[in-house]
From Swiss-Prot:
Gene: serA
Protein name according to UniProt: Selenate reductase subunit alpha
Keyword Protein transport in record: no
Temperature dependence: Optimum temperature is 65 degrees Celsius (with reduced methyl viologen as the electron donor). Full activity is maintained up to 60 degrees Celsius, with activity falling to 25% at 70 degrees Celsius. Substituting tungsten for molybdenum at the active site of SerA decreases the overall stability of the SerABC complex, rendering the components less thermostable.
Species, as recorded: Thauera selenatis
Endpoints of the signal sequence: 1-36
Ranges of residues in domain 4Fe-4S Mo/W bis-MGD-type: 66-129
Function (record text): Component of the selenate reductase, which catalyzes the reduction of selenate to selenite and allows anaerobic growth with selenate as the sole terminal electron acceptor. A c-type di-heme cytochrome of the cytc4 family was shown to donate electrons to the selenate reductase in vitro. SerABC can also use reduced benzyl viologen or reduced methyl viologen as an electron donor. This subunit is the catalytic component that coordinates a [4Fe-4S] cluster and the active site molybdopterin guanine dinucleotide cofactor.
A GO term for molecular function: molybdopterin cofactor binding
Cofactor annotation: [4Fe-4S] cluster; Mo-bis(molybdopterin guanine dinucleotide)
Compartment(s) of residence: Periplasm
pH dependence: Optimum pH is 6.0. Activity is also optimum at pH 6.0 in the presence of tungsten.
Amino acid sequence: MRKVMNSPDDGNGRRRFLQFSMAALASAAAPSSVWAFSKIQPIEDPLKSYPYRDWEDLYRKEWTWDSTGFITHSNGCVAGCAWRVFVKNGVPMREEQVSEYPQLPGVPDMNPRGCQKGAVYCSWSKQPDFLKYPLKRVGERGERKWKRISWDEAFTEIADKIIDTTVKRGPGNVCMPKRPFAVITSAGYSRLANLIGAIKPDVSSMTGDLYPGIQTVRMPARTVSTFDDWFTSDLILMWHKNPIVTRIPDAHFLTEARYNGARLVNISPDYNPSSVHADLHLPVTTGTDSHLAAAIVNVLIADKKYKADYLKEQTDLPFLVRTDNGKFLREKDFNKDGSDEVFYIWDSKSGKAVLAPGSMGSKDKTLKLGAVEPALEGTFDANGIEVTTVFARLKAEIAPYTPEATHKTTGIHPSVVRQLAGWIGDCKALRILDGYNNQKHFDGFQCGRLKILILTLIGHHGTTGSIDTTYEGWVLEGNKALGGVKGRPGRSVSMVLAQWVWGEQYRRSKAYFDDTELREQIGFGVDEMEALRKESEANGWMPNWQSIKDPVVYINAGINTFATSTGYQHLRENFLKRCELYVVVDFRLNSGAMYADIVLPAATNLEKLDIRETSSTRFIHAFGQPIKPMYDRRTDWQISVGLARKIQERARARGITRVDDPEIKSFIDFDKVYDEFTMNGAVEKDEDALRFVMEKSKALGPGSYEEVLKRGFVGVGPSAGKTGPVPADKPYRPFTVNVSEKVPYKTLTGRLQFYIDHDWYQRFGATVPKPQYGGGVLGPKKYPFVYNTPHTRWGVHSFARTDQWMLRHQRGEPDVRLNPAAMARKGIKDGDQVRIFNSSGEFFAMAKAWPGLPENMLFSEHGWEQYLYKNMTHYNSVNAELINPLELVGGYGHVKFAAGGFNPNRIFHETTVDVEKA
């Protein structure tokens, strides 16, 4: 065989290359060389003209631009960062962070904000996976055969299918999930869904990002301080939170807090990049966090580290509970006409039970106790009914969970638990950064209640501390006015329950989980979960649209339904059987779009006019549309406008007018959809819709539209806070008015509520916050590895996961992390291709050694597209999910279905797998 010279394996070729390189370098240095640097004249007088400097001009021209504008990158990110974009010849060339945020006194500033994913957006948006034109499927679903069509063709087909489906099968068989994370974008899809009576799934539950346990304690559960408030803390618990990786724009506040004297504690099964910066790392065993939290509560109560006066006023802990049936003592217990929402406390001064002010049924809407001195503990006689207090019940039920008793379960030594509890009891400002991961475990519901109990016992909730879950957003009345339609509520559902039915996830979970093991651990199996789901729907607690409707027309805007759910292939196959027209709206061809019937190209972040509101900063950020939509893209608002116009046009052409919708006491005026959507043309244009939102929002108001486009951001006013005013001179902290102004909480008792006497909570032994079961992962024990899919440094969900620069900063392909000792046992080396599998499915990825992981754990960072995997598998192919019955409850004061608040969260980190070399 002829040998090719200069090949990588040819030693002579390498030597010849090096010899040539050295000769060239020497030649360049020689005075007679044409490469001689003597030709480049030094500048001695900057006012004079020098020849032979054209090479510098060429370089300078690379950095010239025609115009600039502002954008933010927030598809799935809870931050909010202003970037200035430089445009040349109508093309975005680069962008840089804005560093003009005003500084508050006494805390570090927010300048600049951003991360590497935002920095590459101009480059990423030019890659071939970004959509240019509307597409229609011409092959089988998933075959990836398309033809280009016009917007009119696309809108006509979609509009006719919506009308046909509604007329023939009734309203509610159109489903419109959306999560575009921009105000008028989101409002547009909501408004259209409301006008046509469509189903609006809660996608936060789909991704497992709800905090339903905390929602039983306070309303809302999902809220945070502005991130600069971290600096004011002296003890910060990063509980299943990895902010060094996932909160890059804000991680500096943690470092600055440490310089200010704060302690950082990392609680996570793995030793991660945030652990490096912590003063204490607790490697809690997966699925046992509630036991650790219970042990901390145990110590705080036993050592009397709680603030009694705070608990008496701000919580339901002094409320009276009957000893005979475990129910709250209510007004109706003494008066048949009394309220079921008025409760009692024991007044130590008068020695009798008195009505507690501030509850849902109370006429006294205040937490002020006046001369009443509530008892925290004791057993009393209330007119012949024996009662005790919630605190007494809590103390008794938490007593078994000592640090010594929980040691074997959690893996955390008692001395470490007591050390941490001591720090908590003595600190002045506790901050709990509560990550998403814990909520994706069955253990997460009760653990959430226990975490907020820790903060509450020491009196820091609403005072000096906070438990930060995830952003809730600011109060923007204009946003609600644009997205809502009076008398047209649409249909909200839990996406978890919808996919449980439509995707037949119940059948999949039943096949995967070991029924005997499950019953031994939690007391019931998947069959009971399904029965309880049906009972909840029959009781009217959870919406039942998934049980009586089908997603015949499914318009998926800004999310990837299959990639963000369990059992990728299983869900897709079963879901699509019910779906006759599957439409995807996105700015890039994600893996879910490969199975679509029609794909609509949405404008990129660079091409849209919109704003992003998130309560992690005190600013609203602009999608300032530095360039107009390129190719045949349209903004999301114009897509909604165009579809509404076509629905009205086709309805009039076909003689279809009003369709009654008695199930939700509403109607659909098909022949007026466009007129109603645009408010008779008033908000047809993007700029009109955005101005409408901003000028009708008290926290923004007149002039804010011009300012946000001029600066890239605009500050919010005091009324923006959902649980209290936004102060002008310090960071925002939620729930302060409940303490300072004695405003009741939006709970049944009007307090931070830790006792739920609902029948189901009594049935499952969960009236007070305590571990729901013995702890540990619930997946089949025959698979040796616990499987987890944490957030990544190199993307925001799927955002930037295909960018060439982000891929070059990692392995360039999907990987899984394993402890080196586990790899050695399996005969796997770093870089090997491996197969991860269980009875639910399989996927293939590159093995990556990760010493910070426990030996029984396997991580695969999420966000990867299906088409990046061998055999088109996916990291969610192996997951299976469970439903916690406590999350199915409704009809109990504040504990009821709420999109983005309370409904079944996706519990899919109970999965176990095995791994082998591929």
